[in-house]
Amino acid sequence: MGRNRILLNATASLLATMALASCGGGSDGGGTVAPPAPPMSTAPTIVVSRVFAALTFSQPTVLKQAPGDSSRWFVGEKNGLIRVFANNPSASSSSTFLDITGVVDASGEGGLLGFAFHPDFPITPEVYVSYTRSGAPLVSYLSRFLSNDNGLTLLPGSEDPILTVLQPQTNHNGGDILFGPDGYLYAGFGDGGGSGDPLGNGQDDENLHGAIISH
């Protein structure tokens, strides 16, 4: 008798649970559970708008402003030019900030690939430029250039090479450079190129390819 009572109690509890689940809280008594509302999207809204529509550049590789100066933009072109123009939506002309087209090898994935203003520019009138230089073999140059007109232009003849790195291939030639908040200059030169990373440069901590250096 006791066993039958336990079975009856268990059956009653199960039926009650099923009945509650079928109710679902719907107001129409139909027993249908509404699906949960989808989570609100947290993705940012991105709008692409054309700016400086009156300006055109040849294979631009870098776009940046000098420290503390929002009045101008500087554009590096693959062929070895750095051009400057006013930060005005209606700007229609640009001028040459630096021209080293005569020494830059812009073939393959090389060219003028990066530049960085000294953090105190133009008080300290130095700009660092990273590019691949014409000649054989192909070599990446990290050089310092000076301004003698309060930062309006750079002197091509003032070039002071800081570091040179041999490039065994004409692809994967890196060259982005920037100053960190610690005041050091950081630079990379790519992984040395070649299909399938044949030299394993990225895993070699004694090789400047596939690395970031500080100066």
Name each region found by the language model.
Residues 1-12:
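Bacterial N-terminal signal peptides that target proteins for export
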Residues 20-22:
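C-terminal motif of bacterial Sec signal peptides marking the signal peptidase cleavage site
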Residues 25, 29-30, 35-196:
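Acidic, Gly/Ser/Thr-rich repeat motifs that build Ca2+-stabilized beta-propeller blades
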Residues 141-150, 201-215:
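Beta-propeller blade signature
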